[in-house]
C-alpha cells in the first residue's frame, strides 16, 4: 500500500495533507490544548481525526473546518464523532471565525495545519485575535522559528512582527517526519499562540502596521532608509530614535509599532 494512504484515505498533495499518526505526540498536543467546555473548541483541518477524536471525547461539542469533501463525509458518518461535531465544509482562509463565538465563551483553536497555507492562515486568524483565547498549531518547524524569532535573527520577519504584536508565542514541542503519513520532507513543531488581552504596544491602525512591515521586509538586505524612505522622513526616524542604517530584521516589534503610530499621527 502507498505510504500516502492512511485509514483508507489517500493524502492529497493539493490540500497539503500529512496525517499525524504518532500516539505519543497526539497525547502531548491534546494535553497542551487542554480541551474544556468553557470555550468554543475549534479544529482547522481535522483530517482523519487524530486530534479530533481525543479532543471531542473531552468536550460536549467540537467545531471543525475542513476543505476536503471526502473527509467531511467521513466525519459525518463517524460512529462516535458525528453527534459531537459541528462541521463547516470550506476554506479556513475564507472562514469568518467570529461567527463561532458565543456569549461568555472565547475560541480555543487548534490544528495540524496544511503547510502550504500556514502563513496566510496565521495572518487571517490574527484578524480574530480578540475572540480567541488560545491557538495550538502543528506547523513546519521553520515557521515556528519565524513566529518566535528575536530581532537580529535570520528567521525574524513580517510574520514575526505581526504574530508577536497580537500574541505571546510559545514553542511547545518538535515533531519528526516519521510521526506522519505520508512523512513530510521537513521537521515539524507545535506552537502555542496566546492573543493578548491588552497589547504591550498598541497600534493606532493595524493596517498601517501591516503595510509598514510588508514594505520594510520586501527587500531584507536593504536598510530602513532605502525601504521606508517613502513612508517616514529623516526627521521622523530621528524623533523615534531609530537608526535608518539598520536592516528590517534588526528592528523590534515595539519600534515597528512606534513607526506605524508616527505615520497614523501624521495622517490624522
Swiss-Prot record:
**Which Cys pairs are S-S linked?**
none
* Localization terms from the record: Cytoplasm
Q: Which reaction does it catalyse?
A: adenosine(1518)/adenosine(1519) in 16S rRNA + 4 S-adenosyl-L-methionine = N(6)-dimethyladenosine(1518)/N(6)-dimethyladenosine(1519) in 16S rRNA + 4 S-adenosyl-L-homocysteine + 4 H(+)
Going by the UniProt record, its keywords in alphabetical order are:
Cytoplasm, Methyltransferase, RNA-binding, rRNA processing, S-adenosyl-L-methionine, Transferase
E.C. number, please? 2.1.1.182
Please provide an example of a Pfam family that matches this protein in its UniProt record: RrnaAD
Its domain of life reads Bacteria
Q: Which PROSITE patterns match?
A: RRNA_A_DIMETH (PS01131), SAM_RNA_A_N6_MT (PS51689)
Q: Where, in this chain's numbering, is S-adenosyl-L-methionine bound?
A: 18, 20, 45, 66, 91, 112
UniProt main location, coarse: cytoplasm
Task: List the NCBIfam families.
Answer: ksgA (TIGR00755)
Membership in a protein family: Belongs to the class I-like SAM-binding methyltransferase superfamily. rRNA adenine N(6)-methyltransferase family. RsmA subfamily.
Q: Which PANTHER family match?
A: DIMETHYLADENOSINE TRANSFERASE, DIMETHYLADENOSINE TRANSFERASE-RELATED
> What functional role does this protein have?
Specifically dimethylates two adjacent adenosines (A1518 and A1519) in the loop of a conserved hairpin near the 3'-end of 16S rRNA in the 30S particle. May play a critical role in biogenesis of 30S subunits.
Protein name (record): Ribosomal RNA small subunit methyltransferase A
User: Which species is listed as the source?
Assistant: Shewanella sp. (strain W3-18-1)
Amino acid at each position: 500500500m502507498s505510504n500516502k494512504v492512511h485509514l483508507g484515505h489517500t493524502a492529497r498533495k493539493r490540500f497539503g495533507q500529512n496525517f499525524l499518526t504518532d500516539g505519543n505526540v497526539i497525547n502531548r498536543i491534546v494535553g497542551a490544548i487542554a480541551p474544556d467546555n468553557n470555550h468554543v473548541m475549534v479544529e482547522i483541518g481535522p483530517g482523519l481525526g487524530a486530534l479530533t477524536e481525543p479532543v471531542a471525547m473531552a468536550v460536549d461539542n467540537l467545531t471543525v473546518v475542513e476543505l476536503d469533501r471526502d473527509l467531511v463525509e467521513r466525519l459525518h458518518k463517524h460512529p462516535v464523532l458525528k453527534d459531537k461535531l459541528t462541521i463547516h465544509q470550506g476554506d479556513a482562509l475564507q472562514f469568518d471565525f467570529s461567527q463561532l463565538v458565543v456569549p461568555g465563551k472565547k475560541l480555543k483553536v487548534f490544528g495540524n495545519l496544511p503547510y502550504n497555507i500556514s502563513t496566510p492562515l496565521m495572518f487571517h486568524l490574527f484578524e480574530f485575535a480578540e475572540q480567541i483565547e488560545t491557538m495550538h498549531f502543528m506547523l513546519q518547524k521553520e515557521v515556528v522559528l519565524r513566529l518566535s524569532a528575536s530581532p537580529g535573527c535570520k528567521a525574524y520577519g513580517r510574520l514575526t512582527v505581526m504574530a508577536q504584536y497580537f500574541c505571546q508565542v510559545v514553542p511547545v514541542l518538535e515533531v519528526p517526519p516519521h510521526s506522519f503519513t505520508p512523512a513530510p520532507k521537513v521537521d515539524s513543531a507545535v506552537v502555542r499562540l496566546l492573543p493578548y488581552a491588552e497589547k504591550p504596544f498598541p497600534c493606532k491602525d493595524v493596517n498601517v502596521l501591516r503595510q509598514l512591515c510588508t514594505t520594510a521586509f520586501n527587500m531584507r538586505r536593504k536598510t530602513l532608509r532605502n525601504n521606508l524612505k517613502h513612508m517616514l522622513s529623516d526627521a521622523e526616524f530621528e524623533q523615534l530614535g531609530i537608526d535608518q542604517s539598520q536592516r528590517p530584521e534588526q528592528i523590534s516589534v515595539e519600534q515597528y509599532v512606534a513607526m506605524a503610530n508616527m505615520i497614523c499621527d501624521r495622517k490624522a
